[in-house]
Amino acid sequence: MENKGNMELSNSYGFYKNGRRVSFVKATSEQSLDEATFIEKGSAQAFYHSLFENDRDNSHTMNSKRDEAGFACEVCQIYIPNSKKINHFKSMTHLLSSQHISNKFQPHLLKPKSLGYRVLSQYGWSPQGDTAGLGLENQGRRAPVRAFRVKNDTIGLGTKIDLEKVAVNKCRKGKRQCQIQHSKDVRLKEALIKHFSSN
């Protein structure tokens, strides 16, 4: 039998054709998160703080020792230096911790003359976004519906249109063709009158 070193040769191609197979070594043992405590606490803020509780306590002591001016964020309940104030308000930690992010109505590009705009205004919709949406609990539509296709024909809903007939009607005839068609119609009319009057 071959020795163990030859058995570990891989059947790969290219640069590592005759190289030994590299065995995977875990860096550290896996640590499972306690999901029961996360579900009981029920908020992203509590879960985030439970992950970094020791770091947070250390940062409080370090910041208290420093004379750097800052403030305590009421939403996240952590101390923030003034130099990192804007970055903190944009951070995911602060956004997840905030109970309510105001969702103001964004200005729209529809004109007040549009049909959807007028219909919603008649039912109590405010274009400034002061009021909530339509409906009993104000959870309905807050923006007018844009009409992408206006129905200008007189054909009812659900009817099928014969596209060949529409194409024939839409093609415009020239002056000469109209004269020829008119003379054919006159001759046909005279022939019909002559036929029925002779009987």
Curated annotation (Swiss-Prot):
According to the UniProt entry, its GO molecular function terms are: RNA binding
Q: Which domain of life is it from?
A: Eukaryota
> What GO cellular component is one of the record's annotations?
cell division site
Report the InterPro entries cross-referenced here: G_patch_dom, GPANK1
G-patch domain location, by residue? 112-160
Q: Which PANTHER family does the record cross-reference, listed alphabetically?
A: BAT4 PROTEIN-RELATED, G PATCH DOMAIN AND ANKYRIN REPEAT-CONTAINING PROTEIN 1
Q: Please identify the protein, giving its name as recorded.
A: Uncharacterized protein C1604.16c
Q: What is the lineage of its organism?
A: Eukaryota, Fungi, Dikarya, Ascomycota, Taphrinomycotina
